[in-house]
Amino acid sequence: MVCLKTLSVFLAAFAAADARAVFKTQSSNKADIIPDSYIVVMKNGVSHDDFKAHVSSVSQIHSNNKAKRGTNTNGMQREFDIMNWRGYHGHFDPDTLDEILNDSKVDYVEHDQIVRISGLVTQRSAPSWGLGRVSHRQAGIRDYVFDDSAGRGVTIYGVDTGIDINHQDFRGRARWGTNTADRDNADRHGHGTHTASTFAGTTYGIAKNANIVAVKVLGSDGSGSTSGIIAGINFCVQDAQSRGILGKAAMNLSLGGGFSQANNDAVTRAQNAGIFVAVAAGNDNKDARNYSPASAPAVCTVASSTVNDSKSSFSNYGSIVDIYAPGSDIIAARPGGGSTTMSGTSMASPHVAGMGAYMIGMGIDPRQVCDRLKQISLPAIRSPGPSTTNRLLYNGSGQ
């Protein structure tokens, strides 16, 4: 009996240890970690009711700990539910965090971290060349040749610094979505308006007839948080679902930060739900596998090319990159009217988002778009980087 009792105690202890959630550590710069700010992801199969009960319990635990210890953490901030992928973000003290990790319904927890735009230098009045390049087999031709459907009936979510939805380049096709960054719905930076103009502008865009939704997740300085981005993605999926446009939607994420499993899981759920997701590879001239959401295998990760079909000097690279697209010296709209020129993988990604909408409008399933774009792409990029594709975005115009 003693042996059996000892064994049962051992097994109980083992089960308890096994039930503890994983605390995932990121490979990013520790300076980008937001203190006491955490993203909690539930295990697959946790029901809506169990999730709500867990959230309520954590809120009560945090409140009790705050009262006892006088901590200044803010507790629960926002919840996520992306096609039954459930989680939340909050500011918690160490004792509350420990309780969360010991809950058997929790899959993993990670630090929230700063995420930034993937754009670089602004050069005014520079020539535009990207549209011509993606519609011709040879470089140097400025005419843009495209099917006149141009994304008609497809909606593109611009997850960025906001969008000037009244800009003349959008001709009334843009609407406001949500803001998870701050209390100012304007695009004070210009990055989001520029990328939206690239994926769906009437003058500067690929999918000239697509609808546009502004999803602000980054502030006027071009930075935000992983939790804010996940909240933005959560909005996109729920909005598309409520409007019946899953399968007729795309999303552009011209942003990135250090590796985040939660960020990768969120974009993967969006992609699997029926939204084509294009993301910037990043601008550090390093392997994109260490960045999120660029490292998510399910999405279309885009590196940046120059007018001479070379890898942009700043562009990240690596086997996770799906395709190259024009990203150096790209002219597009700026808030308040007019245009400006920017460089970065931020400028490459919306070329692919727009082309994805273009393909969806022609009947291709969003979950097959990235593979289709790779199939018709051109083997044009010189010195693409270690273990990196040399394929350049092309719309298959035959030119």
Swiss-Prot record:
Active site: D160 (charge relay system), H191 (charge relay system), S346 (charge relay system)
UniProt keyword Transcription regulation, yes or no: no
CDD domains noted in UniProt: Peptidases_S8_PCSK9_ProteinaseK_like (cd04077)
Listed GO MF terms: serine-type endopeptidase activity
GO terms of biological process kind: proteolysis
Xref: Pfam families: Inhibitor_I9, Peptidase_S8
GO CC annotations on file: extracellular region
Entry-listed glycosylation sites: N252, N308, N395
Domain annotation Inhibitor I9: ranges: 37-117
Domain of life assignment: Eukaryota
Propeptide: 20-118
EC number: 3.4.21.-
Main enzyme class: hydrolase
SUPFAM superfamilies (UniProt xref): Protease propeptides/inhibitors, Subtilisin-like
Signal peptide start-end: 1-19
Locations listed in the record: Secreted
Domain Peptidase S8: 128-399
InterPro entries attached to this UniProt entry: PCSK9_ProteinaseK-like, Peptidase_S8/S53_dom, Peptidase_S8/S53_dom_sf, Peptidase_S8_Ser-AS, Peptidase_S8_subtilisin-like, Peptidase_S8_subtilisin-rel, S8pro/Inhibitor_I9, S8pro/Inhibitor_I9_sf
Known role: Secreted subtilisin-like serine protease with keratinolytic activity that contributes to pathogenicity.
Similarity remark: Belongs to the peptidase S8 family.
Protein name: Subtilisin-like protease 4
Name of the gene this protein is made from: SUB4
